[in-house]
Amino acid sequence: ITNKTLLEKAGYTLDDIKSFDDLKKVADDIQSKKDDLGIKGAFTSAGMDGSSDWRFKTHLANLPIYYEYKEDGIDDTEAIKGTYLDQYKNVFDLYITDSTCDGSELSAKTADDSRNEFVNGDAVFYQNGSWEYAELAKTYSDDELAMIPIYFGVDDENEGLATGTENYWCVNKNASEEDVQATLDFMNWCVTSEAGTKSMSEDMGFTIPFKTAEAPSNVFVKQDAEYTEAGLTPVSWNFTTIPSEEWKNTLGSALTAYAAGSGSWDYV
């Protein structure tokens, strides 16, 4: 997520960022003149406490998995080869180097810390998703916000936004037949009726993939559609194939130690 106003204050526009190399060049420059710009860093803190670490042990970790799966033409595997771990390191290095704080502080930084840094204008870039729109819209107008791909240095010219879901509606099969049917009817109403789709779109910020649904007011969702219409390829969420939460926690611990300078990238 990008603060376009701060980006322009630094002398850049979105057109200047079309690849990882571009992003690094811009972020490094912003970091070098952060005091003159009146900010604390190019990126908000990559918080590694439990409220925030999922952004890096899951969502950022999705990128090397996605590109490996894409290259091999698969959608799951027993073990990744690690083909794109160097690119993963490059992005994480950028996050912790061009940051609002020192890497040693990230273990205690929270999701609220990162959001507040962005809301307060302390940083230009903030890795998060469309679900943050409602909070950010309290401070910024749509014209001030943009979402750009997490450029990974692999296929940047064709890369769109990372899109997907890991949440699903489920109905308890052990409930009464009457309750099961009532639940299914309600779920159908939510995604087909005018009131239901309006609530899900405007109040909840969801994308509803049906022609009759209310168009989303969420500017990030609109921008995702624009990227896709322009021919860019959405990055699918393949992190749902990660073995377990324990696996992700181990990765998170390794990332935290690396950021603090007390652990090697080899552990990652």
Model regions and ranges:
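Short helix-initiation/N-cap motifs at beta->coil->alpha
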Residues: K18-K24, E105-N120
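Glycine-centered hinge/linker elements that transmit conformational signals in sensory
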Residues: V26-D28, D72-A108
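C-terminal capping/gating helix-and-loop segments adjacent to ligand/active sites or protein-protein/ligand interfaces
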Residues: T163, F206-P209, D224-V268
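Paired acidic/hydrophobic, glycine-rich loop segments that form the ligand-binding mouth/hinge
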Residues: V124-G129, A146
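Short, solvent-exposed loop/beta-turn-alpha elements that line the ligand-binding surface or hinge
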Residues: G47-G50, I65-N90, K138-T139, F152-L161, ...
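A structural signal for short loop-to-beta-strand junctions that line the ligand-binding cleft
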Residues: I1-L7, G41, D156-A162, T233-T241
